[in-house]
Amino acid sequence: MKFLFAAGGTGGHINPALAVAGEIREKYPDSEILFVGTKDKMESKLVPQAGFDFATISISGFQRKLTLKNIAKNIRTLFYLISSSFQTKKIIRDFKPDVVIGFGGYVSGPVLRSAYKMGIPTAIHEQNAFPGVTNKALAKHVDRVMITVESVRKYFDSKNECVLTGLPVRGEMLRADRDFSRAEMNIKDGEVLILSMGGSLGAKAINEAAVELISKRADEKGYRFLHSMGRYGLWVPDKIKENGVDLENHPNIEIREYISDMDVCMSAADIVVCRAGASSLSEIEALGKASILVPSPNVAENHQYHNAMALVNNGAAIIIEEKDLTGDRLIKEVDELARNKSKREKIGENARAMAMIDAKSKIAEIVVGLAKNSKA
């Protein structure tokens, strides 16, 4: 069987696709898998690193804010749309896939359109609680629409019923053990670990609120802090020191630029403060963590807000919109969770109840079924 995956732009699109491709490769070692993406985005590194073949097309997204610069970019995008149609058809003719799967990002558009016009079975997966423009348009034509959360179903006008699959979670997250992780981080019984992060770049609003939280609660009995400041947050340690905290010698505060052992840190945490990207929320659900979510307002269709509300509406998270985020507001919410164990645990239990830890195998099963039917 031959599988062609289209995913690009961000890790939120690429990593779930890689997880499913890995599942197929493990169960069907004789299968052939090809990814299609762009040469200058994240997929051009992540896909080859995962050991999959990779083909490129020229494509970019439309700029919605109309400026002279963006109008020029949109004209170039129109040209790319025409050329990418020829590129994708050639890739499909050469590879001859049994099924084509799109995981979002603008690269999915031309690949899936070419595939369904050529009569090849197609499927898409929507990671967010509000669909992207590309997936919404494709849903009317593809054979299967797979969704991460139930609340997104109403936004799709698809020719087939949407299938609820969840979102694949990394294996190391599912294997993480809370007691082992807390012992590794030297967290004592009764201590509450507050894990805060604003992504690999470092969201300014989260960094500023976290600085106030850590500075004002540095000596609060039973509080432990681990904060990821990101690439653009290197000012954070100096600001905490300016606020009178002896950061180098403080036993209960750790500041990192990036957290590479997220499985250990998140499994050890009692409270997680973060953005509301789909992958992060699936991990929070899988580990059953109480979370305070600050959706990014700078994403397409404001989808992080919808992602967060899917949990909030089930009593599985607390939301603070970025426009409402202050140090004092974050302190209030953290204090309430840190000092109220039963509330913290209830939110975590509600989050765990939303987890779909078999998402990877479920998606792979659907995709393989389409491939087998194409051969029948």
Give the ranges of each region predicted by the language model.
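Conserved nucleotide-sugar phosphate-binding/catalytic loop shared by glycosyltransferases and other
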Residues: 3-10, 30-83, 198, 231, ...
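Short amphipathic alpha-helix
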Residues: 13-24
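Donor-nucleotide binding loops and adjacent catalytic segments primarily
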Residues: 46, 178-180, 187-272, 305-309, ...
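Active-site-proximal region of nucleotide-activated glycan assembly enzymes
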Residues: 53, 116-179, 187
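Glycosyltransferases and closely related glycan-assembly transferases
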Residues: 87-100, 107-123, 136, 140
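Acidic donor-binding loop of glycosyltransferase active sites
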Residues: 97-99, 259, 263-282, 289
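A short, well-ordered alpha-helix in the C-terminal region of glycosyltransferases
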Residues: 343-357
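C-terminal alpha-helical cap of glycosyltransferases
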Residues: 357-376
